Amino acid sequence: MMQTSSVLMTGAGNVEMHLKCALHFIKDLGYLCRPPDSMFSRTLVNRFAMVDVVHAHLRFRRPLASFDFFMYQENEKLDHGDPAFREMHGCDQRVLCFLAEIAVLSAELLDGSTTRDLVQAKAYTLETEMRIWGHKYYNSMIRGASISKTTTQASSSSPSSQPSPMFLSDISILDIVCECFYWTAQLLLLRRLFLDPTKSSRVQLVRRHLFQIMDKLEPGCGPDSSLPFPFYMAAREATTLEERDWVRRKHAAMMAVYRDRSREYMMEYTEKIWNNAVSVAISNASDDTLSWCTPREQYIRELDKQSTYFMF
């Protein structure tokens, strides 16, 4: 599992091989069914679970660990142990469970092992669970939308350039990063299970809110080191020049602090996705269908499947 950090920083190597070796190691030790006793072992299992789920989303596949892996089942104690999963990765363990289930259902949809109707029926149930668990975040979204409504048209389409001290006094930096992961799970639910296109109002509502709360995080504040996955997943959904320019500025600011090659690769692929969206628009190809058979969606899937970038 420590080798994954080397891949992250250098951008060289095959993280898939390291993950498979780690899975066999964890399985042989019996840690798929129960938490380890030692702190060091718990740290490695926590790391594996996070890397496995994030990598599954980056490659449009199931997590390597089966869905009955104890880390993919709700266990509030894991966020309060030593080490606490939440503090270690900036993501609540329950949100990790949501992300794992979304990855599994998305893979079933793509490989045809489950019908679209059944996958989306399960997605509705999952969405209900996610909304109930994350109800505390919805007032934040309403406040953000209210603030945007009272500002200029330009600022309503792109985040503000300055953090809000009042906002940060109400909530810790770690809480903001955890909220980013929650809304990223909502975004992936919409895009990969309900098959909403980028331009759908629901996708753009979540994307705007993610940009707003990410804009509150100063690069180098600590927990924001966990931000790449939410940031680059949301960045793909930017549609206007203002939004994309904000992404570029935020990326540059984070790169000045966290100099890992994987961020460079993710931004490079984000630019490719944006450029492809422009090409599709010029060719009059429709992006308003719920089907993932459009050239744009096929392009994104193939781009990710063939890529070597990695983050967690």
Please place each PLM-identified region on the residue numbering.
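Contiguous, well-ordered alpha-helical segments that form the cores/surfaces of helical PPI scaffolds
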Residues: 1-8, 24, 46-54, 182-193, ...
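Acidic/serine-rich, low-complexity amphipathic helices located in mid- to C-terminal regulatory regions
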Residues: 3-107, 297, 301-304, 312
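Acidic, Ser/Thr-rich low-complexity linear motifs
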Residues: 34-40, 173, 262-268
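Short coil/turn motifs that N-cap or connect alpha-helices
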Residues: 35-36, 222-226, 258-263
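TPR/TPR-like alpha-solenoid helical repeat scaffolds
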Residues: 40-49, 122, 148-149, 265-277
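Cytosolic regulatory protein-protein interaction regions
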Residues: 63-223, 233-256, 270
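Intrinsically disordered, low-complexity regulatory regions with latent secondary structure
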Residues: 157, 251-312
